[in-house]
Amino acid sequence: MKNLRNRSFLTLLDFSRQEVEFLLTLSEDLKRAKYIGTEKPMLKNKNIALLFEKDSTRTRCAFEVAAHDQGANVTYLGPTGSQMGKKETTKDTARVLGGMYDGIEYRGFSQRTVETLAEYSGVPVWNGLTDEDHPTQVLADFLTAKEVLKKDYADINFTYVGDGRNNVANALMQGAAIMGMNFHLVCPKELNPTDELLNRCKNIAAENGGNILITDNIDQGVKGSDVIYTDVWVSMGEPDEVWKERLELLKPYQVNKEMMDKTGNPNVIFEHCLPSFHNADTKIGQQIFEKYGIREMEVTDEVFESKASVVFQEAENRMHTIKAVMVATLGEF
């Protein structure tokens, strides 16, 4: 699709349904080619910068493996690896990197930062995550749902449970609206998305034959779901008062077997962008348990480890979908 050539991937709202479907189909094709050994490098001799203000396992590995598979060279700049925002403006960093690299990935805090990189670098820029959005994650989520459920995207009943304001919830709602899905956002009223984003997504959903429901009623929200999705309730670095308040608000929205059963769908699947606090077996998980007495947070270990959980297939699909984004915007077809 020539109209994706040289375009940045900052938010799904920049793309039409046809374009998102193209990226998902390309993801399937590239995944199949990798599995059977027929993959052709379409990013040969391309140089890609990975600019990370926030550390990551899946996003970094997905971009690096995808780039190497496609013949590209990668430079990783971690949280202390560049002067952007410290000794150099984002605008200046964009122009420096744009002169050396063919594409730039950014994972960090501000959506405005990734937009500035795209505006001034002169090369495709890909959003690996900001506080407001996470578009590459959603491509992996949707591809996984289609693979497992064997349904067209528009026929999937997709439900997000938890903090309705966070970047993953925002991105999922955008993607579901574009793809014409039936999307439910189940969250406390205090954690609803902004009216501006909600209204925009509802309008897009209506244009594509989809539907968006926001509710704090768990029974109503999860009924008939094909996918139950959640994310962490709080982020490290947020003050203790925020943790305490958020935990109290979200305790009833923990994804557990009872919630999965309430869907009434024996084939419902569970998705999560990871990492997940489903037990106290990590350093942070142990700290949460010691401070708040909570061993399992947004999802129980029972659900996380169940047959319904597709989180590791979903994690692998980060690489295939990210590869599709890079190939579509930078590759030589």
Swiss-Prot record:
The EC number(s) this enzyme carries: 2.1.3.3
Matches recorded under PANTHER family: ORNITHINE CARBAMOYLTRANSFERASE, ORNITHINE CARBAMOYLTRANSFERASE, MITOCHONDRIAL
Role of this protein: Reversibly catalyzes the transfer of the carbamoyl group from carbamoyl phosphate (CP) to the N(epsilon) atom of ornithine (ORN) to produce L-citrulline.
Keyword entries, A-Z: Amino-acid biosynthesis, Arginine biosynthesis, Cytoplasm, Transferase
Organism, as annotated: Staphylococcus aureus (strain MSSA476)
Annotated GO CC locations: cytoplasm
Gene Ontology BP annotations: arginine biosynthetic process via ornithine; citrulline biosynthetic process; L-arginine biosynthetic process
InterPro entries from the UniProt entry: Asp/Orn_carbamoyltranf_P-bd (IPR006132), Asp/Orn_carbamoylTrfase (IPR006130), Asp/Orn_carbamoylTrfase_sf (IPR036901), Asp_carbamoyltransf_Asp/Orn-bd (IPR006131), Orn/put_carbamltrans (IPR002292), OTCase_ArgI (IPR024904)
Keyword flag Kinase: no
Pathway: Amino-acid biosynthesis; L-arginine biosynthesis; L-arginine from L-ornithine and carbamoyl phosphate: step 1/3
Chief location: cytoplasm
Residue sites binding carbamoyl phosphate per the record: S56, T57, R58, T59, Q83, R107, H134, P135, T136, Q137, C273, L274, R318
Pfam families: OTCace, OTCace_N
Similarity comment: family membership: Belongs to the aspartate/ornithine carbamoyltransferase superfamily. OTCase family.
Protein's UniProt name: Ornithine carbamoyltransferase
NCBIfam families associated with the record: orni_carb_tr (TIGR00658), PRK00779.1 (NF001986), PRK04284.1 (NF003286)
One of the record's GO molecular function terms: ornithine carbamoyltransferase activity
Keyword Amino-acid biosynthesis appears in the UniProt entry: yes
Binding site for L-ornithine: N167, D231, S235, M236
Location(s) in or outside the cell: Cytoplasm
